[in-house]
């Protein structure tokens, strides 16, 4: 595939056009896939025709390879790994993937230490693949400009990511006890947003979990409820928001339809209509999403 040197500027966004060997012209764009979202394993993939990042590797390598093959993607085209935090459902395969494919792993120093100590990560990250990032300090990695930001959660450390690429913005906020002031800005600047809607408080309180675990989930460093997620969207989403995906739903304390309806109801109370003002979907826990074109 050859890059045409001419760049077309429209609405102040640079679009790079490609021509393949069949003479077909295609627009370079960002795409998104979720390979799993929940306590069974999390992994999110952002990619263009020439670059890519994988955020979290809590899904098994064999499973990831199968998903890549099913979507006609090359596993060898993964270029960078970013990690949100050191819980097993986000990092259990990060060492294996980094070692087997010689991939750099970006996260905070504390998360790197947590990964090193995590017994669930059987193969550790080689020192030359360890890349330390700082919260609120943007970095340029290939075609991506990425800003990590602090996320309150009871892990060693935790970050979300605000990604800028190909003229669009994408934000990931997961495993979050409460929405911080810094997140307000990133939600407001997002064209595409993945945000946690972990549980129904009613289902959690009536469920079989021991009280200490309920308190942990409901605490300021636990997980975001459906209601809190809906309130964050209603309060801070801007007209530039195009698509929202609800992520990390609890299998025991939530249902996809309940999460979506709860968020939709809160949005309607503020005059925001899902499906009209922006698209709203729920990411599946154990199976991949479709491929989304972020334009």
Report each predicted region and the residues it spans.
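Metallo-beta-lactamase
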Residues: 109-159, 165-167
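Metal-dependent catalytic neighborhoods of phosphoester/phosphodiester hydrolases
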Residues: 92-101, 117-119, 254-261
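Active-site neighborhood of phospho(di)ester-bond hydrolases with catalytic His/Asp-centered motifs
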Residues: 55-58, 78-86, 106-109, 171-174, ...
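Active-site metal-binding motif and surrounding structural segment of the metallo-beta-lactamase
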Residues: 61-108
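Conserved beta-strand hairpin/beta-sheet module of binuclear metal-dependent hydrolase folds
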Residues: 17-71, 159-175, 192
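Structured catalytic core of nucleotide-sugar glycosyltransferases
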Residues: 33-43, 85-94, 148
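Cap/insert and terminal regions of metallo-dependent hydrolase folds
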Residues: 181-281
């Amino acid at each position: 595939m050859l890059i045409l040197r001419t760049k077309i500027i429209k609405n102040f966004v640079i679009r790079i056009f490609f021509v393949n060997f069949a003479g077909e012209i295609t627009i370079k764009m960002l795409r998104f896939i979720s390979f799993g979202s929940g306590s069974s394993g999390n992994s999110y993939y952002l990619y263009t025709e020439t670059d890519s990042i994988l955020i979290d590797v809590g899904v098994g390598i064999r499973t990831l390879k199968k998903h890549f093959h099913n979507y006609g993607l090359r596993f060898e085209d993964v270029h960078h790994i970013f990690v949100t935090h050191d819980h097993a459902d986000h990092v259990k395969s990060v060492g294996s993937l980094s070692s087997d494919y010689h991939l750099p792993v970006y996260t905070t120093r504390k998360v790197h230490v947590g990964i090193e100590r995590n017994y669930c990560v059987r193969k550790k990250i080689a020192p030359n693949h360890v890349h330390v990032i700082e919260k609120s300090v943007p970095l340029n990695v290939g075609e991506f400009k990425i800003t990590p930001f602090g996320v309150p959660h009871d892990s060693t450390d935790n970050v979300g990511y605000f990604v800028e690429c190909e003229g669009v913005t994408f934000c990931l906020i997961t495993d979050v006890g409460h929405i911080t002031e810094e997140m307000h800005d990133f939600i407001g600047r997002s064209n595409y947003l993945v945000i946690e809607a972990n549980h129904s408080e009613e289902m959690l309180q009536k469920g079989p979990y021991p009280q200490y675990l309920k308190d942990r989930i409901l605490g300021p460093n636990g997980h975001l409820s459906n209601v809190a997620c809906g309130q964050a969207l209603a309060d801070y989403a801007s007209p530039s928001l195009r698509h929202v995906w609800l992520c990390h739903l609890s299998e025991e304390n939530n249902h996809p339809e309940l999460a979506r309806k709860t968020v939709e109801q809160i949005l309607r109370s503020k005059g925001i209509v899902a499906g009209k003002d922006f698209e709203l979907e729920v990411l599946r826990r154990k199976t991949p999403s479709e491929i989304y074109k972020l334009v």
